[in-house]
Swiss-Prot record:
Molecular function terms, GO-annotated: S-adenosylmethionine-dependent methyltransferase activity
Stored CDD domains: AdoMet_MTases
Protein name, entry field: Nodulation protein S
Function comment: SAM-utilizing methyltransferase involved in nod factor synthesis.
Length: 207
């Protein structure tokens, strides 16, 4: 279903924060715990993360309310979270309650981390970027943080869904940009049968 708020919003970092703040205030943000489609999406992400390997040192970009963070904390050797919103970090910390997790309030386009990671996960984040060069820069940041034998798990609604919401770069567009630096090794499509419930989850490695 098209969301008029998304169509009308100025998607600067401040605009993204304003847009997401009201969703984070809900008891079950984005219906992640109660929606079958969201559960399938989380399952596919974890399946791609864990397929045939350990997670090692993990970077999660965009934690929302912590549903994926909670799962990653169980399987990772170390877990670092980069999130744009203070409110999202607080919500995720309340849910996960793990003092070993490292939290950074940063923009994916301007990440400043002195580390390398075995697994980087970035889902439901990159479609908020509306300039191709900023998106290319965010992807380059991710590549630079990924170890040579690491894996990048990417997830996003498909192009048609994102465009119906007023976003320019959905899953197919991001993956096309990413393939100059990364190769796709596995890809899943999740379709919940309702408007807006159509996404891609992909595993990529460095070229």
């Amino acid at each position: 279903m098209e969301d008029p708020d998304l169509v009308a919003t100025n998607l600067s970092p401040a605009g993204v924060k304003d847009l997401l703040r009201k969703d984070l205030d809900a008891r079950d943000p984005w219906n992640i715990s109660s929606c079958e489609y969201e559960q399938k999406r989380l399952h596919a992400i974890m399946e791609l993360c864990l397929g045939g390997r350990t997670l090692g040192d993990v970077l999660e970009i965009g934690c929302a309310a912590g549903a994926l963070t909670e799962r990653l904390s169980i399987y990772s050797q170390s877990l670092t979270v980069v999130e744009l919103m203070t409110e999202a970090i607080a919500k995720a910390q309340e849910r996960v309650n793990n003092s070993d997790i490292i939290w950074h309030e940063q923009d994916v386009c301007q990440m400043d981390l002195n580390a390398k990671y075995d697994t980087i996960i970035c889902t439901e984040v990159l479609y908020y970027i509306h300039e191709k060069e900023r998106l290319r820069g965010a992807l380059e940041n991710i590549v630079q943080l990924l170890r040579s034998d690491g894996q990048f798990i990417f997830g996003s609604p498909r192009n048609a869904v994102c465009r119906s919401w007023g976003h320019l770069f959905g899953a197919e567009a991001v993956l096309e940009l990413a393939q100059s630096r990364l190769r796709i090794v596995d890809l899943r499509r999740i379709n919940g049968g309702l408007p807006g419930q159509d996404c891609v989850i992909a595993k990529l490695t460095r070229r």
